[in-house]
Design a protein with these regions (language model features):
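Intrinsically disordered, low-complexity linkers and terminal regions
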Residues: 1-157
Length: 157
């Protein structure tokens, strides 16, 4: 019997545990099939932003995943460099506070990826899921971009 994951709303056998199993199976696919591996970081970021009480408890963890989501959607080509800059900034004494969460985390869930068998469809499904999640965090777009800008200037010191 399906029950809803209380964080993302996915109806799945086992609720929270079932949702986590889907996430783990996606990670396994990315590990076993290199055609999907390039998406691993953003899959983790999107899933974390839909499960912030588990994967974004600390302000720094939350900031890393929110900025990762922002960067991938707005500057995919530069995402690796920006993410490295954010990581350096967050590894230092950065004064980051976890902001209030939105009331929901997007209409789409990790289920979008489950049936995408080829990398092109997987990428398209991932982009839809990521965009849905990012849209849910509209109130934090300015914050994410400010954190990115701060991290980039931090690296130039």
């Amino acid at each position: 019997m399906s029950e809803a994951c209380p964080s993302c709303g996915l109806a799945v056998a086992g609720g929270t545990d079932g949702c986590q199993r889907l996430f783990d199976s996606i990670g396994l696919r990315e590990y076993e099939d290199m055609r999907f591996a390039r998406y691993h970081r953003i899959v983790v970021d999107v899933y974390a932003m839909q499960h912030p009480d588990r994967y974004g408890r600390s302000a720094k963890s939350f900031a890393a995943h929110l900025t990762g989501l922002c960067t991938w959607l707005e500057n995919e080509a530069g995402a690796q460099s920006v993410n490295a800059s954010v990581q350096r900034w967050l590894s230092g004494p950065s004064p980051v506070a976890r902001p209030p969460l939105p009331p929901s985390y997007g209409a789409l869930t990790i289920r979008e990826l489950v049936e995408a068998e080829d990398p092109a469809r997987y990428g398209e499904a991932l982009r839809r899921w990521a965009q849905s999640t990012w849209n849910a965090y509209a109130s934090l777009h300015v914050t994410a971009r400010a954190w990115i800008a701060t991290s980039l200037s931090y690296g130039n010191r």
